[in-house]
Design a protein with these regions (language model features):
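Nucleotide/phosphate-binding catalytic cleft detector across ATP-hydrolyzing
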Residues: 2-183, 200-215, 227, 235-329
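Conserved blade-register residue in beta-propeller folds
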Residues: 45, 193-195
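Ser/Thr-glycine-rich phosphate-binding loops at phosphate-binding pockets of nucleotides
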Residues: 186-192
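A contiguous pocket-lining binding segment that forms or flanks enzyme active sites
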Residues: 223
Length: 329
């Protein structure tokens, strides 16, 4: 029997503006394909972004908002970020964050019950060794019942596709990749680096560096503490990193901006270590680190493309999984 797709509209990832439009969910034979980008800073789906902070409560929290109820325990999600760990399958909280992310994505379409095929990813150089363990981790419960923000969800997991982080964000743009290109996926915990030559990813030329945005965050907070003797809110530093400014006095802003410029300089220094030469190749940047390069970096804008859509990788996961499942028939 030939496989048929649902009537749910499907459009290429790059044509969607997440600020104004919904990225339509892929579906095959009544199975929802849901992508989750497990970041150290944020959990992303095709249409949602949630900070990875999570805190457990034995009783229902006083304040509402982003509350997951699972196995009799309440979890408030979205306050702060998680610490870096090299193997997410060793951290049970990422499973809870996955359930939350799926619920948020389903809620966009007012869906409460679904057969789900997950699409997710791992850092480029870790996927070979961690793929099967992470797949088993995500599929540990074939059927799950839970509540998120007071709404009940019933999921049946039917499969899971895993991809290298970063690359899926640009897979729909490969037609523009002529000659030598370098992809840098700068997340909260790591920077993944991949060469793409004549539209083909070079698996032998990929690296993962622990040089994520969180290192800049820590350095900025420490610099303020050392120079002024005060602690600064992480949310204030994050605003400066994202937008280049914040409503604080000039000395504090200058201090944090200086650290951000040093961090971006280190990013480019690391890329050069892997033979990055702006005269000979184009650089594509995905992930949250792109805004730091834009705000604090010195670079040739005609040779560097910063992909602003923080959900681009999740959309890519979803597209790749949909195409793969459709080919299987």
């Amino acid at each position: 029997i030939p496989q048929q797709s649902s009537t749910t509209p499907v459009r290429p990832a790059e044509s969607i503006n997440t600020k104004t439009e919904v990225f339509f969910m892929r579906e095959l034979r009544n199975t929802k394909i849901i992508a989750v980008d497990h970041g150290y800073g944020n959990m992303k789906t095709a249409n949602t972004v949630t900070p990875t902070g999570i805190k457990a409560y034995k009783t229902e929290p006083i304040f509402t908002g982003n509350i997951l109820e699972y196995n009799g325990i309440y979890y408030r999600i979205g306050e702060g970020h998680k610490e870096f760990i090299p193997d997410k399958a060793m951290d049970e909280e990422y499973y809870l964050l996955t359930l939350m992310a799926i619920a948020r994505e389903l809620n966009v379409f007012s869906i409460r019950e679904a057969d789900v095929h997950l699409a997710a990813g791992l850092p480029l150089t870790w996927i070979r060794t961690q793929r099967e363990a992470f797949r088993s981790y995500l599929l540990q419960n074939p059927e799950v019942h839970y509540l998120f923000n007071g709404k009940e969800y019933h999921l049946r997991f039917v499969g899971c596709s895993l991809y290298p982080q970063g690359y899926p964000a640009i897979v729909n743009q490969l037609g523009n990749f002529k000659g030598t290109n370098l992809l840098a996926d700068i997340g909260n915990g790591t920077m993944n680096i991949l060469y793409i030559n004549n539209k083909k990813a070079q698996e032998s030329r990929c690296w993962t560096e622990k040089l994520g945005v969180n290192q800049c965050m820590i350095a900025a907070k420490n610099a303020v503490l050392d120079k002024f003797g005060v602690k600064i809110e992480e949310s204030t530093v994050e605003q400066i990193l994202r937008f280049g400014t914040a409503d604080i006095s000039a000395p504090y802003l200058d201090c944090i901006s200086s650290i951000a410029r040093q961090y971006v300089a280190e990013l480019f220094s690391t890329l050069r270590k892997y033979e990055y030469n702006p005269d000979l190749m184009r650089l594509y940047v995905v992930g949250g680190g792109g805004c730091l390069i834009r705000n604090f970096g010195t670079y040739d804008k005609s040779r560097v493309t910063i992909i602003d859509d923080i959900c681009a990788t999740a959309k890519g996961y979803e597209s790749l999984a949909y195409m793969s499942l459709k080919r299987r028939g």
